[in-house]
């Protein structure tokens, strides 16, 4: 009987003292491809989608086309080059990690402009 109790106690101690080795999952890095964002720019509510190839389309929520071009991540910045203007590349700060749908952040451009951007469900846009 004593052997059974000691053996049971030893097994319980071993089972309870095993450290949890599961590592905490590292959050995914921020990415642009296949994402859609909403924001208000100069009083216009805008929806912007970036496809898998890094092409973006920016439309007013009412459907009016505003801009399109190429988007690329450069470090912690999202950089956009419009196919419609001669402004050149404009880069904005981004969070370090991916945002879930419904989450927002304030992006700051290289020119010092600030914009509150909200991630929404991916919606491929067409011109």
Located regions from the model:
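Lipid interaction determinants
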Residues: 8, 17-68, 74-127
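Positively charged n-region of N-terminal signal peptides that target proteins for export
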Residues: 1-4
């Amino acid at each position: 009987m004593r052997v059974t109790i000691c053996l049971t106690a030893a097994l319980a101690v071993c089972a309870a003292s095993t450290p949890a080795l599961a590592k905490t999952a590292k959050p995914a890095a921020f990415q642009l491809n296949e994402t859609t964002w909403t924001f208000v720019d100069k009083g216009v509510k805008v929806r912007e989608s970036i496809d898998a190839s890094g092409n973006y389309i920016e439309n007013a929520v009412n459907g009016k086309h505003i801009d399109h071009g190429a988007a690329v991540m450069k470090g912690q910045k999202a950089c956009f080059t419009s196919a419609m203007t001669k402004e050149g590349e404009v880069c904005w700060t981004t969070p370090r990690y991916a945002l879930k749908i419904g989450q927002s952040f304030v992006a700051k451009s290289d020119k010092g402009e600030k914009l509150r951007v909200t991630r929404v469900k991916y919606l491929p846009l067409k011109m």
